[in-house]
Amino acid sequence: MQLPLLQPAIFIRRYKRFMADVELPNGEILTIHCANTGAMTGCAEKGDTVWYSDSKSTTRKYPCSWELTQLSNGSLVCINTHRSNQLVHEALQNKVIKELADYSEIYPEVKYGEENSRIDFLLKGEGLPDCYVEVKSITLVKNSIGMFPDAVTTRGQKHVRELLAMKKQGHRAVVLFAGLHNGFDCFKIAEHIDPEYDRLLKDAMRQGVEAYAYAGAFEKTQEIPTALSLTGKVPFIE
């Protein structure tokens, strides 16, 4: 997935959920939009280098958007979780997700379920059961272990219930944890943050819901991040 043209700044603070102040190389303070509504644990430390894009829009109040954080250890994190579906869509098209490579048709954002949800991707293929794929972003990493969620997620809990219902109807149901952070080599559910999500997902997995975690890797040109892609499955620690 190609990233927009990025420019560096130093993170100062995040506030009102959707806004952040950063310091430009010339010392100017710029307010940028933050698309991530989560806790962003470990991704928003004062003094971190951030990378932002400029939409050049004349109608947006904050035309610049926070895209990545470069951590003190050198790891990169895509904090713009709106990009996760684009990342996974590209991986599905390129058959990177081996468990789903047999499907030929990809339908994004399809309404389904009894709780008025939208599935990130509905996959179809000749002679195959319909496959419902829910995408979750891995931005939280500790000791090289990727984790989800970074805050209690009632929405995520609802998605697990909906996926289990699809499985019981004879379809495939998959939670795909996508690496937006390049600093992990295995994955686990952050049960210490959301024990209910952990309980629901593990129960659903015992009943046939599938869960996979894929690592992400960034490409750079002259030290500027230019692309992000999913590279391969990592171990899922239960």
Curated annotation (Swiss-Prot):
PANTHER family: SUGAR FERMENTATION STIMULATION PROTEIN A. HAMAP family: SfsA. This is Sugar fermentation stimulation protein homolog. The gene is sfsA. Belongs to the SfsA family. InterPro entries: Ig-like_dom (IPR007110), SfsA (IPR005224), SfsA_C (IPR040452), SfsA_N (IPR041465). GO terms for molecular function: DNA binding. Pfam families: SfsA, SfsA_N. Gene3D superfamilies: 2.40.50.580, 3.40.1350.60.
